[in-house]
């Protein structure tokens, strides 16, 4: 039988491992949030130097995902966590993958910044920065929900998803109208459509993180929510 001191040491070591994993996820989330806000700044101000920095720094987020997965697997194999602790580890592992994909979407937007500089300009589309700000707020809030392990905050983030879908569909219609009115705008509008789609997907992934936070905190699946219609998918079907 283990002595009380040995049990205490094991519990402390486990808590340190779990804390280290959560710290990795928070660091990864912070870098992903910076990537998104910097991408929006680069896009709005046509800053190709900033866009290039975003593309380069994506490697750091990729490396953190690999490290988070390694730490999570080590905890599972050595500590055999149960109940709440197991949910925390599984959630962290899944969230790290989601954050990496979100950062990839931000990187994809950044790659289009120098391309758009050399294309036919169009009238400002006010919906795009509004959509970007809403998605940024979703990401910021869901990271706060994860740090606080707060299921109510997670639910609030998920409620934004349909609003983002609505903005995306609104922007889709605006850009479609531009293309119909002037064929010279088609290439620019297509790039903007892909940017909007990437933002919409980041919003979806923020909601996926909210679902994992809710699950880790409560042990239950987040209640079903209404999803907006994807006009781009509808056009292709």
Swiss-Prot record:
Q: Highest taxon of the source?
A: Bacteria
- Cross-referenced Gene3D superfamilies, in alphabetical order? Phosphate transport system protein phou homolog 2, domain 2 (1.20.58.220)
Q: What is its main location?
A: cytoplasm
Question: InterPro entries in the record, alphabetically?
Answer: P_transport_PhoU (IPR028366), PhoU-like_sf (IPR038078), PhoU_dom (IPR026022)
Pfam families assigned to the protein according to its UniProt record, in alphabetical order:
PhoU
GO terms under cellular component: cytoplasm
Compartments reported by the entry: Cytoplasm
The SS bond pairs are: none
Q: Listed GO molecular functions?
A: protein homodimerization activity
Q: Identify the SUPFAM superfamilies for this entry.
A: PhoU-like (SSF109755)
Entry keyword set: Cytoplasm, Phosphate transport, Transport
Q: Which GO terms describe its biological process?
A: intracellular phosphate ion homeostasis; negative regulation of phosphate metabolic process; negative regulation of phosphate transmembrane transport; phosphate ion transport
Described purpose of this protein according to its UniProt entry: Plays a role in the regulation of phosphate uptake.
Oligomer status and interactors: Homodimer.
What family does this belong to? Belongs to the PhoU family.
**Any idea what this protein is called?**
Phosphate-specific transport system accessory protein PhoU homolog
